[in-house]
Amino acid sequence: MSETALDLARALISCPSVTPQDGGTLGVLESRLKASGFRTHRLTFHEEGTPDIDNLYARFGSGAPCLVFAGHTDVVPVGTATDWRFDPFAAKVEDGQLWGRGAADMKGAIAAFTAAALTFIEQHKDFKGSIAFLITGDEEGPSINGTIKLLKWAAEQGEHFDHCIVGEPTNPQVLGDMIKIGRRGSLNGILSITGKQGHVAYPHRADNPVPKLMRLIEALIGTPLDEGTDHFDASNLEVVALSSGTDAYNVIPAKAEARFNIRFNDLWTPQTLELELLARLDSVAEGTAYTLTFEPCNALAFITKPDQFTDLVANAIEKQTGRRPELSTTGGTSDARFISAYCPVVEFGLVGQTMHMVDERVSVADIATLETIYTSILEGYFP
């Protein structure tokens, strides 16, 4: 590994960029890219009720094909800083590890790809094609003023991407474990029933909505939504909260509601899920009036089917680690869901065991290997 990758990772981690703060991270990255000939654009996106977010777009070259790297420089809060072995923004190197908030998720990967890209450009000055960066400060937050708007802006400028790598920490245990080739969708909903409040000693004067809610919940979770597909696990509806608006033991509540989340595969859309849930509820409602509402969904299921590009990435990983990575769609959502509407996308970064945790850290050796993997991908992509 050139010192550039580790130095850049430390410089990025040293910037306290807890969403929505940038902390100077984009300036650090932009200066490196500009110095190597990238055209850069800093963009601040706005939306009422949300914080303004800074974003960075950079591109070297103008021809096709274009390989774009996408990532986020924002990080989650550190919690109690004194619980950490080292200052979470000191970017300390100790015991062969780089310590700090964002080391795994995902400043280490941004640094590794940047170092790989700069070295590749220096060694292949006349390569045919383009390398681009989509970097946001709004991935750990509401994801409203980040990648989704950056992609729209790029399309309006006539920018075209052929393939994308997202530097999420995809490896559960060791580097080379896993490539993400898709993600499940995510849909939030609320099921509510209105009854009549009353004293528990006089139930005939009230209408308790809780037993009715329990019966309807059973209709939602009693039968699996599906059995999964070739690339996805079965879809899952998980009830995450129950409430009735009162903590008193002697009061029958006037209203009861259940909040739930569905992680769904490529057999479903938010619209077909809504129809399925309504059909299940109506089959057992027996005259019970209910309300079923959903939050707006910006997390659809997507898949990049295995092809030459996924083989290129997998081969580069196997060459450097000796492991053939699993092609997976497990885990939560990421900004890859937005990118999938523009080009095929895969995710591969560092090991994610400590992401979002106290004492987040990554192996310095893994940063070196990841840089080499990214370099191998670039060399295979632009022969």
From Swiss-Prot:
Reaction equation(s) it catalyzes: N-succinyl-(2S,6S)-2,6-diaminopimelate + H2O = (2S,6S)-2,6-diaminopimelate + succinate
Binding site for Zn(2+) 1: 72, 105, 168
Keyword annotations: Amino-acid biosynthesis, Cobalt, Diaminopimelate biosynthesis, Hydrolase, Lysine biosynthesis, Metal-binding, Zinc
Gene3D superfamilies: Zn peptidases (3.40.630.10)
Free-text comment on the cofactor: Binds 2 Zn(2+) or Co(2+) ions per subunit.
UniProt GO BP: diaminopimelate biosynthetic process; L-arginine biosynthetic process; lysine biosynthetic process via diaminopimelate
Catalytic residues in the record: 74, 139 (proton acceptor)
Entry cofactors: Zn(2+); Co(2+)
Family affiliation: Belongs to the peptidase M20A family. DapE subfamily.
Its job: Catalyzes the hydrolysis of N-succinyl-L,L-diaminopimelic acid (SDAP), forming succinate and LL-2,6-diaminopimelate (DAP), an intermediate involved in the bacterial biosynthesis of lysine and meso-diaminopimelic acid, an essential component of bacterial cell walls.
PANTHER family in the record: ACETYLORNITHINE DEACETYLASE, N-ACETYL-L-CITRULLINE DEACETYLASE
Protein name as it appears in the record: Succinyl-diaminopimelate desuccinylase
Species of the source: Beijerinckia indica subsp. indica (strain ATCC 9039 / DSM 1715 / NCIMB 8712)
Gene: dapE
